[in-house]
From Swiss-Prot:
Required for the expression of the mitochondrial gene for cytochrome c oxidase subunit III (COX3). The gene is PET494. It is a peripheral membrane protein. It comes from Saccharomyces cerevisiae (strain ATCC 204508 / S288c). Keywords: Activator, Membrane, Mitochondrion, Mitochondrion inner membrane, Translation regulation. It is found in: Mitochondrion inner membrane. Its main location: mitochondrion. One of its GO terms (biological process) is positive regulation of mitochondrial translation. One of its GO terms (molecular function) is translation regulator activity. The keyword Methyltransferase does not apply. One of its GO terms (cellular component) is mitochondrial inner membrane. Present with 450 molecules/cell in log phase SD medium. This is COX3 mRNA-specific translational activator PET494.
Length: 489
């Protein structure tokens, strides 16, 4: 009797525990299975938490329950969940730490630039006035070479005037104008006329001021005769072969003359068979290229191999960019061309500052030519933006200029670029499916700045900083800025 009561009490306790934790009633049938001779227990559902659905509705529920009911499997799943939460927590802490480190690097770079500015201002105040005036006089002497002219015999001048030149001189009676033919595109025709006359004048200027070389000996007899006419009886003193000085003189005195409406209307490239090799190539490319868009000018520029000609074309394009139409949104290829111009002008301070001013000055109209726009609903007009690659190339150029130890101070430009990155960065969603967002920098005008930047949320800013903190080029440039201050102190 005691054994039966003990069995009943154990069965009762088991039934209560099962019902307590699983809300399921168990009924033990008193029949035995034929194989194992053990009582068979049937379970009935009464709103249980785990077994609240029968097997017909979810056929895999019983298998899932058996899997989790095993102690080893439950421990394995729990361990994986804990490990996953630990990895997520660690990754979050690392991301926050890198974001803070990047912000601290930007602040350290700005503080470093401020200290350098104070030191330079103190040094400038302590310099005597005569040293500054002497430096300005040296610049004037360097930029404007002296040319001494010797008086020629009037008979010699008259004979020289009668000699032939590479460009045949025509009288009014020799010209036969076809009035029915009109210029198909005035801007492209003007660009061709301007580029041709500029490079033709530069080739003469180059051959006149420099000593005779093997390249000049290979020129045609007509071209050498033209050079001799320009140098005969004249003695050149203190002249320097500076491209920027030549371009300023040509642009100021001759560009408007050779590109007057009448001359542009009737402009045709002359017979260039007697020209030097470089000028022959230029004339051939100008003839084959329509030169109507900036993309076509990019093709023309990319085929040129002479660094001198590329510098002249870079100076010319900055002053004549109005000849090419502006795209409103799709300017990806134009921004690539801007990067090429910046990269080619790294060794030329003046050209680099010209093109960097397009980014530094938001009112520069050339931003609409080179950079794609972002439609901003807050101001209801497009806003130009630059890529992170373009930004890093500009910042690198100014840091290189500052590290060369030149007499000019570029701390203000570097400081402004850091502020632009810190305030104007935003995320641009990539149209490709598997590509993440990219960081771009807005270039708003002062009157639109607060409205446009107000649309960028703090969460988007933090995401931008996270991406920037992982960009090796940006982090390395910020470190170089801090190192400049450390070396100077």
């Amino acid at each position: 009797m005691h054994l039966k009561k003990g069995k009943r009490s154990i069965s009762t306790v088991w039934r209560l525990l099962w019902k307590r934790f699983y809300s399921v009633n168990s009924k033990t049938n008193m029949h035995f299975s034929r194989s194992r001779k053990k009582p068979v227990t049937n379970f009935t559902r009464t709103n249980g938490l785990l077994l609240s659905c029968n097997g017909d509705t979810f056929p895999y529920l019983r298998t899932l329950w058996r899997y989790f009911n095993a102690p080893g499997n439950l421990m394995f799943v729990t361990t994986n969940i804990v490990a996953f939460m630990g990895i997520v927590t660690y990754n979050t802490l690392v991301t926050i730490s890198s974001e803070r480190a990047f912000e601290e690097q930007m602040m350290a770079a700005q503080v470093s630039l401020a200290k350098q500015r104070e030191e330079l201002e103190t040094t400038a105040l302590s310099l005597p006035r005569d040293i500054e005036l002497r430096g300005e006089e040296d610049d004037i002497k360097w930029e404007q070479p002296d040319v001494a002219h010797v008086r020629e015999d009037p008979l010699v001048e008259e004979q020289n005037a009668k000699l032939d030149t590479p460009i045949k001189q025509y009288t009014l009676g020799d010209l036969i104008l076809n009035k029915r033919e009109n210029v198909t595109d005035y801007d492209s025709q003007r660009a061709k006329a301007s580029i041709f006359h500029m490079l033709y004048a530069y080739m003469l200027y180059r051959d006149v001021i420099q000593p005779t070389t093997m390249t000049q000996n290979n020129n045609s007899e007509e071209w050498r005769r033209e050079v001799e006419l320009l140098t005969k009886g004249k003695e050149v003193q203190g002249t320097h072969r500076r491209i920027d000085v030549f371009y300023d003189l040509w642009n100021k005195n001759f560009d408007k003359i050779v590109t007057s409406p009448e001359k542009v209307q009737n402009f045709q490239l002359p017979n260039w068979s007697k020209y030097p090799t470089i000028l022959k190539f230029i004339c051939t490319e100008l003839h084959d290229n329509s030169l109507k868009t900036l993309g076509e000018f990019k093709q023309f520029y990319g085929k040129v191999r002479s660094n001198e000609v590329k510098k002249l074309l870079g100076l010319w394009l900055y002053d004549h960019s109005f000849l090419f139409p502006h795209n409103i949104y799709d300017n990806r290829t134009e921004e690539d061309f801007y990067d090429i111009l910046i990269n080619d002008s790294m060794q030329d301070n003046r050209i680099f500052q010209k093109y960097s001013s397009i980014v530094m000055n938001p009112y520069n109209e050339r931003t609409q030519l080179f950079f794609p726009n972002v439609n901003s609903p807050s101001v209801n007009k497009p806003v130009p933006s630059i890529s992170l690659e373009t930004y890093t190339r500009l910042l690198k150029g100014y840091i290189n200029l500052q590290e060369t130890g030149c007499k000019y101070d570029y701390n203000d430009n570097i400081f402004k670029l850091i502020s632009i990155l810190k305030l104007n960065c935003f995320l641009q969603r990539n149209k490709k499916k598997h590509a993440g967002p990219t960081v771009r920098i807005l270039l708003p005008r002062d009157e639109d700045r607060s409205q446009i930047l107000g649309t960028i949320s703090q969460a988007e800013k933090r995401t931008c900083y996270q991406i920037l903190s992982k960009n090796r080029d940006v982090v390395a440039l910020l470190k170089r800025i801090s190192d400049i201050q450390a070396d100077s102190s």
